[in-house]
């Protein structure tokens, strides 16, 4: 069955993964809050990314840079001049669109659009192809104008151009401007990488497709610094690592993932090569994870703007270079959405029954194990077992407790939210010290002594 966006959105809202932000005030467009389950799942994703790409690598460091940076950072990086979208308005109903996206939806292979495409060319296509407004079907468009995507605000009490600052549209620049600090304080030698997870903000003209494109989001970015002659080998290494992570760590079906090499004439101004790893979302194939060779564009640009030399000094060979950079870049909300789409299933059972199942790998499950008393009179004893297990809980191992409703309905709820196992505390538990463990995907059950429960947890709930 083909998964519809409305279906997955309703599921996530109903179970408390995602809420409409400011809902009691009728919400705020394109703004979402992550409920208790969504917050846990997002944290699991981030921990898994750090474990795989940072903490298990001998040449990686972690950074947490400021959201608000000196505006000259954005002047040097090109964001003030180039980080914009072509905005066009419908003259009839005043609806606003990205002109390039309207044209892309024509699916006309003869039309090539890049970030450097002249606005007059886009205007002519809108006229020649009689592109209609999605809301009122008018073909009467305004002139295209460039709309900068950075959120602008002011620092201090005076709102003038001297106090203008911006919320960062990416985390990468915080890494580049700290290159010298990291080399000096951490005594780094090329090649090495720096990773960062943090908030970024983009004032998108047409956000949408649920959490796929939002104005506030989290990024996981790595800037890997290296000599030019090592670029190809490391670029290929990251291709393999990203695919391995998606398929073998997140257990995403490889049929839902494909590579897309960006054509030379479509590359961003800073990139000499970019591969997008695309996922088949409900709205179609779209970018999930980007991998770019940025050359030495950023370090050179910041050297020129700041007057500080951001080079690397090889003390053994007595040489200086401005290293090249390879950048894997991922939106946390985007990979979260892909995980939901990949692992959500509606399973048909006997007697015309069905169940919703979120078949998450155990490392991603919001709760690895739920403790459920069979009947209410066993609630106190089951809750004490739950409290005992909480003593061994940590960032990667979480337990939950639920005593409300029939055991069957509780099983269904935990299947739906992705809990890998349910532990049932029944009369055998009380009289013989034996509990029943039910596995989510197969629904098979085993019985184990409570005395062996911690060993079972070590064997089955840690990856």
UniProtKB/Swiss-Prot annotation:
Binding site for substrate: 98, 170, 217-221, 327-331
Alphabetic keyword roster: Aminoacyl-tRNA synthetase, ATP-binding, Cytoplasm, Ligase, Nucleotide-binding, Protein biosynthesis
Name of the molecule in the record: Glycine--tRNA ligase
GO cellular component: cytoplasm
Reaction catalyzed: tRNA(Gly) + glycine + ATP = glycyl-tRNA(Gly) + AMP + diphosphate
Source organism (scientific name): Mycoplasmoides gallisepticum (strain R(low / passage 15 / clone 2))
UniProt enzyme class: ligase
HAMAP family to which the protein is assigned, alphabetical: Gly_tRNA_synth_B
Enzyme Commission designation: 6.1.1.14
Keyword Flavoprotein: no
Matches recorded under InterPro entries: aa-tRNA-synt_IIb, aa-tRNA-synth_II, aa-tRNA-synth_II/BPL/LPL, Anticodon-bd, Anticodon-bd_dom_sf, Gly-tRNA_synthase/POLG2, Gly_tRNA_ligase_bac, GlyRS-like_core
Assembly behavior: Homodimer.
Cellular localisation: Cytoplasm
GO MF, one annotated term: protein dimerization activity
Record function comment: Catalyzes the attachment of glycine to tRNA(Gly).
BP terms from Gene Ontology: glycyl-tRNA aminoacylation
Pfam families, sorted: HGTP_anticodon, tRNA-synt_2b
Protein residues bound to ATP: 202-204, 212-217, 287-288, 331-334
Primary location recorded for the protein, binned into one broad class: cytoplasm
Keyword rRNA-binding among UniProt keywords: no
Annotated family: Belongs to the class-II aminoacyl-tRNA synthetase family.
């Amino acid at each position: 069955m083909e998964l519809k966006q409305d279906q997955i959105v309703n599921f996530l809202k109903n179970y408390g993964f995602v809420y409409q932000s400011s809902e009691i005030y009728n919400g705020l467009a394109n703004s979402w809050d992550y409920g208790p389950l969504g917050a846990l799942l997002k944290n699991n994703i981030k921990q898994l990314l750090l474990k795989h790409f940072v903490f298990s690598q001998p040449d990686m460091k972690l950074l947490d840079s400021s959201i608000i940076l000196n505006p000259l950072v954005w002047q040097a990086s090109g964001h003030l001049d180039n980080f914009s979208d072509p905005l066009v308005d419908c003259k009839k109903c005043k609806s606003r669109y990205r002109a390039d996206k309207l044209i892309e939806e024509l699916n006309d292979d003869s039309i090539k659009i890049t970030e450097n495409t002249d606005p007059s060319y886009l205007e002519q296509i809108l006229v020649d192809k009689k592109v209609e407004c999605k809301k009122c079907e008018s073909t009467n468009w305004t002139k295209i104008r460039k709309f900068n995507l950075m959120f602008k605000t002011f620092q201090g009490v005076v709102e003038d151009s001297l106090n203008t600052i911006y919320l960062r549209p990416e985390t990468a620049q915080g890494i580049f401007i700290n290159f010298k600090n990291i080399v000096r304080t951490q005594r780094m030698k090329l090649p090495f990488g720096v990773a960062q997870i943090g908030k970024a903000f983009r004032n998108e003209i047409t956000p949408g497709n649920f959490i796929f494109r939002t104005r506030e989001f989290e990024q996981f970015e790595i800037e890997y610094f290296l000599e030019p002659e090592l670029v190809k080998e490391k670029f290929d290494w990251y291709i393999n690592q990203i695919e391995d992570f998606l398929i073998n760590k997140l257990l995403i079906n490889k049929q839902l993932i494909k590579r897309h090499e960006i054509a030379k004439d479509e590359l961003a101004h800073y990139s000499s090569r970019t591969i997008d790893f695309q996922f088949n979302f409900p709205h179609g194939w779209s970018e999930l994870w980007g991998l770019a060779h940025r050359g030495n564009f950023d370090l050179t640009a910041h050297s020129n703007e700041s007057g500080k030399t951001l080079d690397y000094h090889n003390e053994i060979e007595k040489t200086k270079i401005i290293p090249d950079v390879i950048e894997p870049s991922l939106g946390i909300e985007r990979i979260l959405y892909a995980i939901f789409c990949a692992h959500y299933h509606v399973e048909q059972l006997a007697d015309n029954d069905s169940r919703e199942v979120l078949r998450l790998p155990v490392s991603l499950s919001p709760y690895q194990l739920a403790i459920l008393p069979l009947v209410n009179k066993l609630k106190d004893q089951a809750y004490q077992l739950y409290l005992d297990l909480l003593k061994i809980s940590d960032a990667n191992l979480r337990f939950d407790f639920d005593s409300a409703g029939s055991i069957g309905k509780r099983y269904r709820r935990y299947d739906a939210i992705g809990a890998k196992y349910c532990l049932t505390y029944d009369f055998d538990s009380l009289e013989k010290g034996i509990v029943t463990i039910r596995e989510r995907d197969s629904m098979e059950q085993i019985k184990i002594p409570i005395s062996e429960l911690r060993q079972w947890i070590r064997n089955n709930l840690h990856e």
